[in-house]
Amino acid sequence: MRTLNVEEISKNIKEMCIEANHFLSKDMDIAMKNAVSTEKSPLGKKILSQLQDNLKIAGKDMIPICQDTGMAVVFLEIGQDVHFEGGNLEDAVNEGIRRGYVDGYLRKSVVKDPILRENTKDNTPGIIHYKIVPGDQVKIKVAPKGFGSENMSRVFMLKPADGIEGVKEAVLTAVKDAGPNACPPMVVGVGIGGTFEKCALMAKEALTREVGSRSDIPYVKELEEELLERINKIGIGPGGLGGSTTALAVNVNTYPTHIAGLPVAVNICCHVNRHVIHTI
């Protein structure tokens, strides 16, 4: 049994919120640089270069890489041999978010009630997901999610007979409908299987997977590669102004499902695709 004070969770999440909003992750940085060299449209290439300049300035001057600093999404993988002390874990997570956004001078974008729309003024609460795993460590993934791309995301409740071709069409439909509104080049997270809520969660977590990696499942790997190729042939391009780079990656997660269903979720993220991972 390992004892861990929840203050460590708060400290880490504060740092992660600030880091995610000022610095592009290494995998995304590589993907963006590669896109500049492979983009076929002169205008698209220019837009990608401008985005690269923006990212450099943000890191150098500690300015957020996007004015929408997002709603904080936190994934916690908690070892079953960890015992927390010093307070409530969920309160500690939200305290870390609060410190990160207040002390980091990040935009506060969360409202207390979806209808009454009163701002909480500290970007809490976050969206928190828990998973119990073997061991005595805690893995934290923080992914601030802007709503330009979030609003473009979709869930499709397909029929089993729709099969993999139906899945492909659902993903392509979501991307086409998103168009320039998702601030492309985008990263596309896809969840297949489970239930209505499970496929959406898988699609969200897929966005935290390293860009450029591929699924270990052969048919899923092929699906990721085919979808990326087909999406980039749509021609939406950087900034939605045309080009060969509409998406930087398609990451697909799958899960067992009911005999009567084929749930598919598409969670789209913009070109910054913020995510930071710490293990305590």
Where on the chain are the PLM-derived regions?
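Non-transmembrane, aqueous-exposed alpha-helical and coiled segments at domain scale
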Residues: M1-V190, T195-I280
